[in-house]
Amino acid sequence: MRITRILLLGLWLVTSHGLQAQRQRTNAYHLEAGGLVASDQTPFWLRANQYGTVPLNGSIARFSAGLKSDYRAADSTGYRPKIDWGYGLDVVANAGATNQVLVPEAYIKGRLGAFELYAGRRRELVGLVDTLLTTGAYAWSGNALPIPKIQIGVPTFTSIPFTRGIISFLGAYSHGWFENTGRQITGSFLHQKYLYGRLGKTTWPFRLYAGFNHQVIWAGQAAPGVLSPNVAVNGQLPSTLRYYPAVVLGSRGNFQNDNVVTSFEENRIGNHLGSVDLAADADIGSWNVYVYRQFLYDDGSLFYGTNIADGLNGLRLKNRNTPAEGAFSLRQITFEYLFTGSQGGDEFVIDDDRRRGRDNYFNHSQFVDGWVYFSRAIGTPFLTPSNEVRPSLNSGGPIGNNRVSAYHLGVSALLFGTVDVTTRLSYSINAGTYPSPYLTLPTQFSGLLTASVPLNILGGTTLNGSLALDSGGLLPNSVGAYLGLRKSGLFSRPANSQAARSSY
C-alpha cells in the first residue's frame, strides 16, 4: 500500500537521522515470540481487545516486533520543547492454522504545545472507562485492528486558561478509511470526534468527568443487488463533501431534490453511534475509586430517553501504595456491568418519539457489513459478530448478538514482588437481535488468567503465559493457552531493567 510505504520511509528517516540530531530522544523496541493453542475456537479473552491481532481459529506460532519513540520528557530544568514529534511501528506475524502478517501500529505524530497531529494506525481506546481491565469502551474498544486515519487533537487533559487547572479538557477530530477487502460496501469513510472535560485538579482528592464520542461510517458503493433502491440509488451512497456537514453534525439536512439521497437518508447521512459518558474518581485512603457510566446511542433513542437503560457501568479500585514485598499485593479490582437489551424497544416509528426503537446496535440497513473492521467488532466485543457465535444460533445481520446483559470482574496483583498476575472473569446472558432473537437465552462464561515473570537473561526479558476458558451456549466451548518470551529495551541508553508486560 502506498500509505504504508510512505510511513515506513518516514520511520527510516527519523530513526536513522533523528538519533544523531537529538540526543534526548528515546527509541524503544520490543521483540516477542510465542505460541497459542486452543481446543476449538480461540477463547474469548485470548483474542478480545487485542487490536485484531489474534486469529479467531486454530493454534498458531506468533511473532511480533515494534519500534516506538514518544515525545521527549522535560529535562532537569523543567524545559520541554513545544514542538516535537514521535512515531510507532508494530508488526505481528501469525503462522499455523492462520497465516498472516498484520501491522496494528504504523504512525507518525507531531506536537505543537498541547495540540497533536498524527497520521496512520495507532492503538487507542475512546471513552471514560478503566483502561487496564475493562471489557472495552462501547464504541471504540481496541477489539479490531486500528483504522488508519488523520487526527488532530489534544491527547491529554489540558487546563483551560485562567482556570488554574480546575477545568481541563481533551479531545480529537479525525478522518479515516475503512478497508475494501471482504466488504460488501467499499470506499467508506470514518468520521470521529470526541470531547471530554475534567473538573478538579490532579492534586484534589475528588474529580468529575463528562464528555461524548461520535463515530460515523459514511460514503461508499455497493455491488449490484446488495442494497435495495429504498436505501441506495444504484448502490451509490452519498460520498462527496456536500454531505460532510450533515455527517459531522448528525443533522437531517435538506436533500429533497438530491438524486443520490433516498428517503432513508433524509433521517441521517451515514451510520452514527457513540456514547455520552459520566465519571468521577476519588482518593480514599490508600485507594483511588473510579466510577463511570457510558450512555449508548445508535440512533435518536438516547435523545428521546427511550434506551436509557442501556449502558456500560464500571467501578475501579486502584491501590495507590507501592506494591508490598510479600507473597501477594493487590493492585486493582474492576467491576463492570454492560446492558444493551433495550435499544429503545421493539418498534421503530420515525415520527413517534416514544417508539424510535430497534436500534440494532452495530448493524445498519445501508452499511450491511456492520460496525466492524476486518470482521472484528470495533466497539465492545460482547456485541458478537455472527461468525463468532455457535453455528446453531440464529443470526440476524453481521452482528448476530447485540442484546446482552454481561457481568465482568477483573483483578490485577503482584506475587512475591515480581510476578504480575491478572484475571478476567465474565458472565453474559444473550438474546440475539430484535430482527432475529435467539429461541433461548444462551448464557456464556469466559475466563482468563495471565502471568508475566521477569527473567534475568538478555536484560529486559519477560516470560508471559495465559490460560483461557469459554463455557456456555453462545460461543463454542474451548480451552486455550499462550506462552511467549518478550524482550524490550531502549536504543538511546542501556536497556531498561524492567521488562514491558505483554498485552495478554
Predicted regions and their residues:
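Bacterial Sec-dependent N-terminal signal peptides
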Residues: M1-R25, S503-Y504
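Short loop/turn motifs that connect adjacent beta-strands in outer-membrane beta-barrel proteins
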Residues: Q22-A28, S69-W85, T98, R111-F115, ...
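Transmembrane beta-strand segments of Gram-negative outer membrane beta-barrel proteins
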Residues: Q22-F63, G78-L89, G171-H175
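Transmembrane beta-barrel architecture of outer-membrane proteins
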Residues: A28, G58-G66, V101-E105, I147-Q151, ...
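Transmembrane beta-strand segments that form the barrel wall of outer-membrane beta-barrel proteins
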Residues: A33, A48-Q50, I83-G96, A119, ...
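Surface-exposed loop and membrane-interface regions of Gram-negative outer-membrane beta-barrel proteins
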Residues: Y79-L112, E124-G142, T181
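Internal, well-ordered domain-core segments that constitute the primary functional module
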Residues: G127-V231
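Exposed, low-structure sequence patches enriched in small/polar residues
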Residues: L208-F212, A222-Y504
